[in-house]
Amino acid sequence: MDTNNIKKIDLFYLNIIIEELNILNIEIDIKELIKLKEEINNISNNIFIKLKLNNINKRIIPILNNNINKLEVIRDKIINNKISINKYPSYISEIININKLYLKILNKIITNNKNIELEEEILFWSDNIKYNLLVIRSDLDPIETNYIDLINVLENKNIDINIYIDLINKLKLDNNLRSRINNKYYDLILNKINYLKELIYNEEII
């Protein structure tokens, strides 16, 4: 797999996980993830780039496992009414799933799986990731960040993104439009997902 693609995948998932852990505001140390993200950002294009990325990804894996374990404990306590449901966002299960998906992708990258591009596409457009990117929160900043993250991905696929930019601008101007915009946006993304999956299954995406 191309090292630039590995770098993009790493930064994409790290950005989401770091942002979500910050919002959750629980006792999970994200300093190491931020540090590893910076290391990835600072990797220059030289003959050792693949080796460096591989080493960093091996260091990310135990952190993800630790995140998953801690988050699952909190989720189970919420389910068993041992923690107030108001203390943590209801989408904590989605954050667990994102950690698991990223973990699965990293394991495939490290083992040099030749089909990683296709499988990564399918994983990325899975319901869990899609839900996380479309989730409506009370805060505008994380909403805006998630929309921009998705737009950047679509832009990399040479897809017309004007309509997505228009939706972000509407979100900025009028928070009351969120639910209606989200429904319209969801339909557009769903169509795009189906289109991408067709390409994947026809082996037209490399």
Task: Write out the residue ranges for each language-model feature.
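Secondary-structure edge/capping motif, primarily at the C-terminal ends of alpha-helices
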Residues: L21-D29, I47-N54, L71-I85, L106-N113, ...
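Charged, well-structured binding/catalytic surfaces in domain cores that contact anionic ligands
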Residues: S84-N158, E203
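Leu/Val/Ala/Ile-rich N-terminal alpha-helices, chiefly Sec-type signal peptides and the beginnings
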Residues: M1-N66, L196, I200-Y201
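C-terminal accessory extensions/subdomains outside the catalytic/core fold
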Residues: Y164-I206
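Generic structural signal for well-ordered, non-membrane alpha-helices
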Residues: N15-I23, E38, N42-N45, N69-D76, ...
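An acidic, Gly/Ser/Thr/Pro-rich helix-cap/linker signature
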Residues: L11-N15, N65, F124-S126, Y186, ...
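Short, charged, amphipathic alpha-helical segments
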Residues: I30-K35, P89, S93, I148-N152, ...
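Hydrophobic, ordered structural segments
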Residues: I60-S90, I95, N99
